[in-house]
Amino acid sequence: MEPNELLAYLQDGINAFVEGSSGNYISMRGALSPSSVGLKLFEPPLIGVAAANDPLFEEMLDEKAVGKQMLMPPDWLEGAQSVVSYFLPMSERVRQSNLEGDLASTEWFHARIEGQMFIMRLGDQVARLLKAAGYDAVCPACHPSMKTTFHDENPSVAYHSNWSERHIAYICGLGTFSLTRGIITEKGAAGRLGSVVTTAVLPVTERPYSGIDDYCIKCGACIDRCPVNAISLETGKDNYACHNALLESKKVYPGYVGCGKCQVGVPCEYTRPVQP
């Protein structure tokens, strides 16, 4: 397959999986509330591609970016040629459910927990699609080498990992960082990210930005949406305050964690806002 044909094949396969997989829907058996039964978690994703040797990967080793613990694409897969990143927008039902109150809605909790499980299943599926086309592929989030550290495990950090999906999305041309340190894409900021490293040579997505936060208009709407005042125009997001609030949310539904208030009811919820 030619690179453009392979990318189209991937897009079609990913879209079919997102629309048809039972993992993208909440069953009656697993629902936290009656309103969550039949809930669709995500819409079809945006996809971006970067060359595995893009110089920006090395820049992620800077402590101001990800840090020296960040693994490079060849660390995940020998012969890596491309990195595929995908952003799955939350469904309309998930977004609307989370507009009111200080606590995340049950729908948002599902999108955060079952949603992440689905993102990993999608990563496995993308790897299978590439292998079926004759290439090797690895989903870092599904790999035994994937490591994440949270504030409650190590008080010296709020959160870090050796493969940052947000920074990968930035390198792959999907979007830039917001004041909340999430990613703003052409389909907004309310969604989740995943990625795959492959030996396939795929068309690289142009990065229509040069700065790390070019898509953020600094409107401050997310500041007003945060229930724990963890965001400011001057310093951005206080990761410790945010993470502590997430830990508190675990007490409501054991095994579930989430907030997402800064991702809804804001100009960047559905799209990339236009600079005034």
Regions found by a protein language model. Give the residues of each.
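Non-catalytic, usually N-terminal nucleic-acid engagement modules in DNA/RNA processing proteins
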Residues: 1-111
